[in-house]
Each structure stands twice: as structure tokens, then as C-alpha cells.
Design a protein with these regions (language model features):
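Bacterial N-terminal signal peptides that target proteins for export
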Residues: 1-9
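N-terminal signal peptide c-region/cleavage motif recognized by signal peptidases
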Residues: 17-19
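N-terminal edge beta-strand
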Residues: 23-45
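Extracellular/periplasmic metallocenter environments
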Residues: 24-27, 74-111
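A structural detector for beta-sheet-dominated domains
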Residues: 29-31, 43, 53, 65, ...
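Beta-strand cores of secreted/periplasmic/IMS beta-sandwich domains, seen most often
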Residues: 39-56, 78-86, 92-94
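Histidine- and aromatic-enriched segments that form or immediately flank copper-ligand environments
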Residues: 55-75, 104-105
Length: 111
């Protein structure tokens, strides 16, 4: 049995969408240039979707060198950032536009 490239592409897209939907969502809010909660625990070895809600009127940049993530989130906007699967440990993140106040930590714990 042979499959056309289009059918294979559709199947790959479907499987990717299923994997993305299966990732648990954790909400982070930026308010008054502070991430809330400032510490988030996630299980090791699992992909997680961070829903970052910027309640401020100004943009903020979610940045983490350890996670290799960087995303500007406009004021009053939301963004989705996928992380993981990760090994146990602490992974700091910060808001590049307000680094003194916008700081947080993703703590990855063994199941």
C-alpha cells in the first residue's frame, strides 16, 4: 500500500495537533510587571503549554536562557509558549523589559 505525500502530510499534522492538545496548560499572568505565580511546578519528562497573559498595558518579553525561549507579549495580549520535556531542576525566566520585577522560576520535579 502506498501513500501520497499529501496524505502523509495530513497525518503528520493531525498527530502533531494531538500531541499539542495533550500538553497540560499552566497560566502565568504578568501584572504590574510581575509574573504570577512566580514559581510554577511541572513534572519531569512532560511537555507543558504555558499560557502567558499580559494584563499590563505595556509589552513584556518572556525570556529564559535555560529554556531557550524568548517571546514578546503585547500589552493586554496572550501568548502560548511550549516547554519540555525537561529534566528535574530549576529553570529561571524573566521579563526582559522589566528584569528587576518580572522574574519567575519553572521548577521541574520528578514524578
Amino acid at each position: 500500500m502506498s501513500y501520497s505525500p499529501l496524505k502523509l502530510a495530513l497525518l503528520a499534522s493531525y498527530l502533531l495537533a494531538l500531541n499539542t492538545m495533550a500538553a497540560p496548560t499552566i497560566e502565568l499572568e504578568i501584572s504590574n510587571h510581575v509574573f504570577q505565580p512566580s514559581v510554577v511546578e511541572i513534572p519531569a519528562g512532560q511537555k507543558v503549554r504555558l499560557l502567558v497573559i499580559n494584563s499590563d498595558s505595556t509589552p513584556e518579553e518572556f525570556e529564559s536562557y535555560e529554556l531557550n525561549r524568548e517571546k514578546v507579549i503585547a500589552g493586554g495580549a496572550k501568548a502560548i509558549i511550549f516547554v519540555g520535556p525537561l529534566d528535574p531542576g530549576d529553570y529561571p525566566f524573566f521579563g526582559e523589559f522589566n528584569p528587576k520585577t518580572a522574574q519567575g522560576l519553572i521548577r521541574v520535579v520528578a514524578p
